[in-house]
Design a protein with these regions (language model features):
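Helix-adjacent hinge/juxtasegments
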Residues: 49-90
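Charged helix-capping and loop-helix junction motifs
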Residues: 65-69, 91-99, 125
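N-terminal active-site segment of His-dependent metallophosphoesterases
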Residues: 1-47, 58, 62-65, 142-144, ...
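Binuclear metal-dependent phosphoesterase catalytic core
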Residues: 15-18, 75, 98-104, 121-162
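Pre-active-site segment of Zn-dependent metallo-hydrolases
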Residues: 12-19, 81, 87-100
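Active-site environment of divalent metal-dependent phosphoester hydrolases
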Residues: 10-14, 35-39, 57-62, 87-92, ...
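Active-site neighborhood of phospho(di)ester-bond hydrolases with catalytic His/Asp-centered motifs
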Residues: 5-7, 27-33, 51-56, 80-83, ...
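A short helix->loop->beta-strand "cap" motif at the edges of active sites that frequently abuts
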Residues: 46-49, 124-125
Length: 162
């Protein structure tokens, strides 16, 4: 399964659509800050499941039932999804990774900092921050049991697209 991961879109719908066209994902995760961008993407691509959480800028932009954190199997892999503000990621990712491990996640997805990051911790936990949509995005690939690939896309990767 190929998952496109976006965050902090702040109305960068053109970039988000370019990412969908380039990656051709099986699912999209939107990690908040302009929750309604995720809903608009879902309307544009009804065949692609969109999973999203609310960010700190979404207080008045999202439905009352919107969650700030989700943890469930995506492509056969347990994924912890959050915007990151409640885990205070601007001060480091220690609390984020501890929460992901507490939930038994194999992957921790977060945003909020606008700084892209993709790495694997010593214990095997994948950590992905796609940065700010409009400048970067993340891609997570699984084989139904484990992460097979995790990488970042930048504006440069999408330059050949109209």
């Amino acid at each position: 399964m190929k998952v496109l991961v976006l965050s902090d879109s702040h109305s960068s719908l053109r970039f988000m659509r370019k990412c969908v066209e380039k990656v051709k994902p099986d699912a999209v995760v939107h990690l908040g800050d302009h929750y309604d961008d995720g809903e608009e993407l879902a309307e544009s691509y009804p065949q692609i499941p969109i999973h999203q959480v609310a960010g700190n800028c979404d207080r008045y932009r999202c439905p009352i039932h919107a969650r700030e954190m989700l943890c469930y199997a995506l492509g056969g892999v347990m994924v912890y999804m959050t915007h990151g503000h409640r885990e205070r990621v601007k001060s480091g990712i220690g609390y984020l990774t501890a929460e992901a491990r507490r939930y038994g996640a194999q992957v921790a997805l977060y945003g909020h900092t606008h700084v892209p990051d993709c790495h694997r911790e010593e214990d095997g936990l994948w950590v992905l921050n796609p940065g700010s949509a409009g400048r970067s995005a993340g891609v997570l690939e699984t084989d139904g049991q484990a992460v097979t690939s995790c990488y970042l896309l930048t504006e440069t990767d999408l330059e050949d697209m109209v």
